[in-house]
């Protein structure tokens, strides 16, 4: 019954086994809000664990310090589990986290029950470092530490940064793109998150307009963020970028490719753009024809 009341987005999130595990530990009255990402779920769960520690006669500070110590040691060693002996934490705090099923102990080795939980706490570290104005490489890590596992932590950090403030997200992303000390598949995370934004705000819109022709990463933005995504192509059209590119022989093909990539999902303004430029050049008309589907049932009245 509770599951059926959840939003579609949350149901989709819970298809991931580790997310479902976390959700099952949450108080049901807490889960119908905005917990729409893995980060939200983990944050709510740990808040709940800390809150309930008081009823067990423990101080929240003890629980938080135990968690911090575990994360510290795992980060320094680069491991998912570490010997209990080297943690040097209060036994009561560790036992409580184990009984809460967020931490596990096997053969005297301690770690979090799922790697996504460690990833989230590591992404929190990155957020703290960012607001303490640390260097880019100190936040993400040196190249030798830019592993696939670290990539997911950076992804969580960037998603949380975007949620906090899109301007900070853009500033940090631009630093990543121009840095020689960041691997490309880490830079690509920035493109991925941009591509997932359905309703770009003013900061995102301005970034796209200012950088779609950037000499360093303009083509990457076109291919990985703008292409096939109507929300971004609409921005370029509304700001006159498509019109300008159409007037430039060397860029005209980009306009054709962008419009074709969102067909048949063309709106009235897209069709008006095509109408303004159609029937003036046979070669251009052949390119515009790519926006028309062979299946007429999918075409709009405006396109006809």
Each PLM stretch: what is its role?
Residues 1-144:
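Extended hydrophobic
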Residues 79, 106, 124-304:
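Extended amphipathic alpha-helical scaffold segments
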């Amino acid at each position: 019954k509770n599951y059926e009341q959840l939003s579609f987005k949350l149901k989709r999130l819970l298809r991931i086994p580790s997310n479902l595990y976390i959700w099952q530990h949450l108080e049901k009255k807490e889960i119908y809000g905005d917990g729409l990402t893995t980060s939200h779920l983990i944050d709510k769960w740990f808040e709940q664990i800390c809150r309930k520690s008081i009823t067990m006669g423990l101080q929240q500070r003890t629980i938080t310090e135990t968690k911090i110590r575990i994360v510290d040691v795992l980060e320094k060693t680069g491991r998912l589990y570490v010997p209990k002996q080297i943690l040097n934490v209060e036994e009561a705090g560790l036992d409580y986290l184990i009984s809460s099923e967020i931490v596990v102990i096997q053969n005297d080795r301690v770690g979090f029950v799922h790697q996504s939980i460690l990833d989230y706490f590591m992404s929190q570290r990155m957020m703290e470092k960012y607001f303490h104005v640390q260097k880019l490489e100190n936040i993400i890590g040196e190249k030798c530490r830019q592993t696939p596992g670290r990539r997911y932590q950076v992804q969580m950090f960037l998603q949380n940064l975007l949620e906090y403030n899109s301007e900070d997200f853009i500033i940090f992303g631009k630093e990543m793109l121009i840095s020689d000390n960041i691997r490309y598949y880490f830079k690509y995370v920035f493109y991925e998150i941009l591509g997932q934004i359905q309703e770009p705000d003013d900061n995102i819109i301005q970034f796209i307009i200012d950088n779609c022709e950037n000499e360093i990463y303009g083509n990457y933005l076109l291919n990985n963020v703008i292409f096939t995504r109507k929300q971004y192509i609409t921005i370029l059209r509304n700001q006159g970028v498509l019109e300008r590119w159409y007037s430039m022989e060397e860029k005209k093909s980009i306009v054709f490719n962008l419009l074709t990539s969102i067909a048949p999902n063309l709106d009235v303004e897209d069709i008006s753009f095509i109408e303004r430029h159609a029937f003036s050049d046979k070669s251009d008309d052949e390119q515009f024809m790519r926006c028309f589907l062979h299946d007429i049932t999918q075409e709009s009245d405006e396109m006809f």
